[in-house]
Amino acid sequence: MESTIKNGISHAKKAALLSIIPGIGQLYNRQKIKGCLFLGLSILYVFVFADLFNMGFWGLFTLGTEVPRDNSIFLLAEGLVALIVLSFGLFFYYLNLRDAYKNGEMIDQHLRVNSIKESYHALLAEGYPYLLSSPAFILLVFSVIFPILFSIALAFTNYDLYHSAPANLADWVGLETFKQIFTVDIWRSTFINVFG
């Protein structure tokens, strides 16, 4: 064990630290093809989704600034899509860190690290159910979870007839809409009649 742990830092920890940039930890673990794949996918992810993140998060926080150019509802939807895509990217980033650390542990224990072909066969053998159900999960996220998130987020805006595109923009109002259910007489009586 002394040969693999120098200066108190194990190979696994070094690989995990190097994996802050995806793929570098795999390259450090002598998994060149996997490292290049992770690095390439990460670079593609950043370039492909850079505009979505830029406009999406700007739109999610501001809901637009200029009439009639901005549509608050479209910006809200784009921002939620950016959040979902970011969560998928963070999950990939976690898998990258975990993979580098686990393979670094194998090197610390003087075990042989799997080649790309062996990793592929292990993925098919152990992760086949996840691999097969992942397209359905992605479809589920965008067809079920996204509309629910959109409806919840819309409830915290002042979107109504008087705050709709292209003439006006919606704004974030927090819990003000929910407060009005109990303070506006007609809304309160309707709410009480439905639940009372």
Region locations from a protein language model:
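Transmembrane helix-loop junctions in multipass membrane proteins, especially transporters and channels
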Residues: 54, 58, 104-111, 156-163
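Juxtamembrane "helix exit" motif at the C-terminal ends of alpha-helical transmembrane segments
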Residues: 44-61
